[in-house]
Amino acid sequence: MSSPDRSIDIDLEKYPSTATKSVYGQSKDDKNVFDIHPTESEVIPGEVEYADTPSHQNFLQKFFSDFKPVKADREDGVALKRHLKGRHMQMIAIGGAIGTGLFVGSGSSLADGGPASVIIDYTLIGIMMFFTVYALGELAVSYPVAGGFYNYAVRFIDPAWGFAVGWNYFMNYFVTFPLELTTCAITFRYWTDINSCAWITIFLVFVICINLFGVRGYGEVEFILSTLKVVATTGFIILAIIINCGGVPTDPRGYIGGKIIKNKPFRHSFKGFCSVFTTAGFSFSGTEVVGLAAAEAEDPQKSLPRATKQVFWRIAIFYVVSLILIGLLVSPDDPRLMGNSSDGSTSPFVLAIKEANIRGLPSVFNAVIIISTVSVANSCTFTASRTLHAMAAKGDAPRFFAYTDRLGRPLLAMAVCLLFGFFAYINAAGDVSDTVFDWLLAISGISNFFSWGSINLCHIVFRLAMKKQGRSLDQLGFVSPMGIWGSAIGLAFNILCLMAEFYVSLFPIGSKPNANDFFQGYLAAPIVIAFFIGYKIYDRSHIPSLSKLDLDTGLRTYPPKDKESEKIRDAKGFFKWIWQSLC
């Protein structure tokens, strides 16, 4: 066997298993890969293991055999498979979170805050996410463990806080799944009045089928759907520029320029400005999934830094540029916007095309919205099931949810998430469904800010502990070029967003302070606090000191020649540093 190119900090005396060519981030045929594969009783916590599957079976035998538990049932329950390739990670990063928050939710933001508020707030949230994803990228490359930032919060902040944000993160995507299925059905009203339950059934079955193929199915579907979303959004940007410049013969408005945005840049004064933060946060929901997917990536050390850098371009192009153009083309007073109408089949993107009197294209983009919604629904089941699986493996959720079958599927965690999708059928209950979905949406409303703030705080504590213990950043596979200050800025932004939403929830637009509006806007906060205090009372956990913080378990180190971060650190000149950081 050739000498290893990577150094893995595992004590061979403690883990005397044989060294084999194996799976950490590469195919088994890669002679440059060296892996220490421990025995079943000597499992290294946080590592992802390949499950053995029987050979010489026919299709039906293999199908049913795949549902059996993995051969090695580990304490942390991590038996997921590394099947996400680099191209999957790239598209999850670029287009994974582009969905109803951008295409539909931006309509209510435009109606509530006006185009200037939308552009400013989405840009601020984009900057915050830029810092957050880089911090997550550094942590995920160093610790590519199942559960992502939930495990980081348990380790670096406090077990009680990890428990609270873990359940908060799970419930966010758990309740969003039926909401996305309902949005799919409602969007079809643009063409037909067929009962929404029919469309819910079709898309629910589709998502269930995707999950039967495990993480490989998720990766392939997300790759295809994200590609379609990216192409469609790029096409819209080009078309919107042509419309604004008066290049569409069917548009009687001619050259538009900045007429619309100058007329009413802001709506509802400061309250309107603050109200957009929640919708913007929902629009960026899922950006952090690329870190969660690290546990199932073939080579997180190579694919994660590249995927992390793509987030900047997604924010800059697909969010900021497209919303600037929406502000130039769609009036915030348009009664068809989501904020002013119960008709969920329209979005500002569709309205911008319809106002130019272009036939056919509004239907095409409405189809893109449906594709985006299916993509988000697919991501919801992936994210919720993996988070529940990780919590169960650590004892923060019922243990049976840690069950993993031979294909690496967290079967029971996945099943409970998919079963909750049937809750979408309550849409047939009329007005009752609106009330139910309002409260479900309230659970996920501001939960993202707790998750993203925790990621930044984990990175800050991680860096401080590294410094306190005299560790060098040279051993890390990827180093965030924004450093600890980038995470501090990201954390501050999250706190400001929580404060802004508290203000709007307490003093809602167009009405007096009332308990109903407050809890529909801020319900996630008391839920997180209740989980945190409850765990503290039960377990009496404590915040670990920086000098005693465990930095070794699950840590992956790499020689300098194999590190993506070396390119950034060695870059000469400011502009080259910028290029290496973003490309």
Swiss-Prot record:
Keywords: Amino-acid transport, Glycoprotein, Golgi apparatus, Membrane, Phosphoprotein, Transmembrane, Transmembrane helix, Transport. It is found in: Golgi apparatus membrane; Membrane. Its main location: Golgi. InterPro entries: AA-permease/SLC12A_dom (IPR004841), Amino_acid_permease_CS (IPR004840), APC_YAT (IPR050524). GO terms for biological process: amino acid transmembrane transport; nitrogen utilization; proline import across plasma membrane. The modification Phosphoserine is found at residue 22. One of its GO terms (molecular function) is amino acid transmembrane transporter activity. GO terms for cellular component: cell tip; Golgi membrane; membrane; plasma membrane. Gene3D superfamilies: Amino acid/polyamine transporter I. It is a multi-pass membrane protein. The keyword Phosphoprotein applies. The chain crosses the membrane at residues 91-111, 116-136, 159-179, 194-214, 223-243, 311-331, 364-384, 410-430, 435-455, 476-496, 518-538. Glycans are attached at residue 340. PROSITE patterns: AMINO_ACID_PERMEASE_1. Belongs to the amino acid-polyamine-organocation (APC) superfamily. This is Uncharacterized amino-acid permease P7G5.06. It comes from Schizosaccharomyces pombe (strain 972 / ATCC 24843). The lineage of its organism: Eukaryota, Fungi, Dikarya, Ascomycota, Taphrinomycotina.
